[in-house]
Amino acid sequence: MQRCEITGTGLISGNQISHSHRLTRRVWKPNLQVTTLVVNGSPIKVKVCARTLKTLKGASEVEVMRILKANIATLSERLLKHLNK
């Protein structure tokens, strides 16, 4: 499933509304991008949404660790494993 590995942002479903106000179900997908983070000295490729990527852009390793620890409840299991090393 498409989900940001840091914030947990995933699919959102709702209605698409036409000009005549006819409702059809649709799904909004997160804008996921693959980026490399340095966690505990080792590079890791992660899928993050564009908003998270904007936050991480230009962040030092210390700031990245602070962001990861702030979102510990929504981190993927793979990131949790690297964080606990």
Swiss-Prot record:
It comes from the Bacteria. Gene3D superfamilies: Ribosomal protein L28/L24. Keywords: Ribonucleoprotein, Ribosomal protein. InterPro entries: Bacterial_rp_bL28, Ribosomal_bL28, Ribosomal_bL28/bL31-like_sf, Ribosomal_bL28_bact-type, Ribosomal_bL28_sf. GO terms for cellular component: ribonucleoprotein complex; ribosome. GO terms for molecular function: structural constituent of ribosome. GO terms for biological process: translation. NCBIfam families: L28. Belongs to the bacterial ribosomal protein bL28 family. This is Large ribosomal subunit protein bL28. It comes from Fusobacterium nucleatum subsp. nucleatum (strain ATCC 25586 / DSM 15643 / BCRC 10681 / CIP 101130 / JCM 8532 / KCTC 2640 / LMG 13131 / VPI 4355).
